[in-house]
Regions:
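Internal intein/HINT superfamily modules and their associated LAGLIDADG
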Residues: 1-178
Length: 178
């Protein structure tokens, strides 16, 4: 897999990309009971083949740790530092599109209560999917594109072109299929 260095022209696109990643195959967990005062944790789940992407994100966010499970190639990039959680929440707030925003709102309530963060809950994003990097993050999390040729191209012949990696480009927000 080729790893490219990414150029971020605005932090805003990073937030859309992170929101897409979390909504695609990530989670925000808020502890309850006696552990409620501990900061929430953000977890991105991925396959070991995607390690360069998450190492790059870890470097960009300057926080977190990566866990590698012994079986199945499953990995998790976890962010649990309170200041880093607040930083990520500020990046992704207002950029969610799915019901996972409920977990984001619980995390905002938690950091507002225990860290005096004073973060407002922004509404769901309704902008066009081609206006930002959200879709790139969502597809990078757990997606692929397929093209099936049938009919006049061959009745029994079909070919699939599957996404190996959607590369996010912050400047143009274009997905490149390889």
């Amino acid at each position: 897999m080729t790893v490219r260095k990414y150029h971020f022209n605005t932090k805003n696109q990073l937030g859309y990309y992170l929101a897409g990643l979390i909504e695609g195959d990530g989670s925000i967990k808020v502890r309850q009971g006696k552990k409620e005062a501990i900061a929430p944790i953000i977890v991105f789940t991925f396959h070991k083949n995607e390690m360069p992407l998450y190492e790059n994100l870890k470097e960009i966010l300057n926080s977190g740790y990566i866990l590698v499970e012994k079986k199945g190639g499953v990995c998790r990039y976890c962010i649990s530092n309170a200041d880093a959680i607040i930083q990520v929440i500020n990046h992704i707030n207002g950029k969610y599109r799915t019901p996972k925003y409920h977990a984001l709102y619980k995390a905002i309530d938690n950091v507002n209560k225990w860290r005096n963060a004073n973060i407002s809950k922004l509404p769901l994003d309704t902008s066009s999917l081609d206006s930002n990097a959200w879709l790139a993050g969502f597809i990078d999390a757990d997606g692929h594109f397929s093209i099936k040729l049938a009919g006049s191209y061959g009745s029994d012949t079909s070919e699939s072109l599957k996404k190996k990696r959607v590369i996010f480009l912050w400047e143009s927000t274009v997905c490149i299929l390889s």
